[in-house]
């Protein structure tokens, strides 16, 4: 495609955008495969009692996904977004097979190493490609739609695997979904997805944002907006790692069956996913700082309340509240990062952010696992809730008053 014929925008590129949304739903479904049943698999089939040992699969996933995120950002302009997406799906193919036939917990950890690499390559690629297609004005909406598809799929597949496990056993049937998702995701990406590098070149011609000499340092520490968002991303996934590993175990201790565990654990990513259709658009027109502050605060409150409630209704409501808080921040993270960086450095900056964000999975699993082993699950959950509230305070203090990056010149000329 020639640069002169390229037009940025959601409407102008709706076919490729819609295809990438579908692909990202399959990417999310691969994570949903594990959300409700892997901690149970650890206790019931492998006899693991140490919470740190059980959460080792999340540590493996988080570290490898974080590293894959970073290198996807670094290599996107060199290797190509589509090529990285296809490689990610190829790596995903053996994951459900390993989970079906694993006779040792180490194989489950290996499967999650592959899952982390695959997720880093596929999800990061689809995120960056959608940013490339739509341009600056609709980027929040685009990220909302992207994350909606991904995390709604997480919720749906988490529910389905919980239901199948309840009626037909934890293995092998729930993991057949993963075989379907990985094969179809690979075919769609390989045959129909088109690379978006030329869109970046087109947008870079009109960008007024200066390039940074050190993208990693600027995103992580130097820039107040970028660093505030980055720490919040880490804490967000830190608490998500804890929820992923400990919530099913907490619900097992409360004597919920697999079906109800599947429902409660599915509500959180489902609300998270669906809510982003609204919050993504809001991040284009409303204060990003306020959305990030209130989102992290809501998450922290919901998490701290978890150990004190025992009924299905109250826990389902908290799961929904946690999902709402996450929906407020997730598309806002990405749209803020994208708008604060030069188009030619966007992929690397997003990759740096996603490196730290997804290291949160590993850090959260380690902190909550060790705390749960020494003091109990309830104390681990409360500690993570406190850290999440602290993150909201950091946003309030460090992030500039407004981070909307409005194109004032464009607005004046339109008038």
What is the predicted role of each segment?
Residues 1-14, 195-229, 408-415:
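Juxtamembrane intracellular "pre-TM" segments in multi-pass secondary transporters
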Residues 10-62, 227-228, 232, 236-254:
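Helix-loop boundary and gating motifs at the non-cytosolic
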Residues 20, 106-112, 228-229, 313-319:
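Short hydrophobic/alpha-helical segments at membrane-entry points of transmembrane helices
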Residues 61-70, 155, 269-277, 361-362:
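Residue-level signature of mid-helix packing/kink "hotspots" within the transmembrane helices
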Residues 68-80, 276-287, 372-373:
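Helix-to-loop junctions at the C-terminal end of transmembrane segments
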Residues 83-97, 290-305:
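Structural signature of the two symmetry-related core transmembrane helices
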Residues 113-151, 336:
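Cytoplasmic helix-loop-helix junction between adjacent transmembrane helices
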Residues 180-202, 391-400:
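C-terminal membrane-cytosol helix-exit motif in multi-pass small-molecule transporters
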């Amino acid at each position: 495609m020639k640069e002169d014929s390229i037009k940025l925008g959601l409407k102008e590129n709706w076919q490729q955008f819609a295809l990438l949304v579908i692909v990202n739903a399959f990417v999310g479904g691969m994570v949903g495969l594990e959300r409700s049943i892997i901690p149970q698999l650890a206790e019931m089939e492998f006899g693991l009692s140490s919470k740190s040992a059980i959460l080792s699969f999340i540590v493996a996933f988080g570290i490898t996904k974080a590293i894959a995120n970073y290198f996807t950002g670094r290599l996107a302009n060199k290797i190509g977004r589509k090529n990285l997406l296809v490689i990610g799906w190829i790596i995903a193919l053996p994951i459900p097979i390993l989970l079906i036939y694993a006779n040792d917990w180490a194989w489950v950890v290996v499967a999650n190493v592959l899952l982390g690499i695959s997720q880093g390559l596929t999800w990061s690629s689809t995120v960056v490609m959608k940013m490339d297609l739509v341009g600056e004005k609709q980027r929040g909406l685009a990220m909302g739609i992207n994350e909606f598809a991904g995390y709604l799929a997480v919720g749906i597949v988490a529910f389905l695997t919980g239901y199948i496990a309840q009626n037909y056993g934890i293995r092998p049937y729930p993991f057949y979904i993963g075989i379907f998702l990985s094969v179809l995701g690979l075919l769609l990406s390989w045959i129909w997805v088109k690379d978006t590098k030329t869109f970046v070149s087109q947008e870079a011609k009109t960008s007024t944002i200066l390039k940074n000499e050190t993208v990693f340092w600027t995103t992580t520490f130097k820039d107040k907006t970028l660093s505030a968002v980055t720490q919040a991303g880490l804490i967000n996934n830190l608490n998500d790692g804890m929820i992923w590993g400990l919530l099913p175990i907490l619900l097992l201790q409360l004597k919920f069956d697999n079906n109800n565990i599947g429902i409660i654990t599915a509500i959180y990513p489902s609300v998270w996913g669906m809510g982003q259709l609204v919050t993504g658009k809001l991040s284009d027109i409303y204060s990003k700082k306020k959305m990030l502050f209130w989102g992290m605060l809501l998450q922290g409150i919901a998490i701290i309340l978890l150990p004190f409630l025992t009924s299905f209704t109250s826990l389902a409501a908290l799961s929904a509240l946690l999902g709402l808080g996450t929906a407020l921040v997730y598309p806002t993270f990405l749209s803020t990062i994208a708008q604060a960086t030069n188009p030619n450095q966007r992929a690397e900056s997003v990759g740096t952010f996603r490196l730290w964000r997804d290291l949160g999975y590993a850090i959260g699993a380690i902190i909550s696992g060790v705390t749960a082993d020494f003091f109990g699950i309830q104390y681990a959950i409360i500690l993570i809730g406190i850290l999440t509230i602290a993150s909201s305070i950091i946003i309030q203090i460090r992030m500039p008053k407004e981070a909307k990056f409005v194109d004032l010149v464009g607005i004046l000329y339109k008038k």
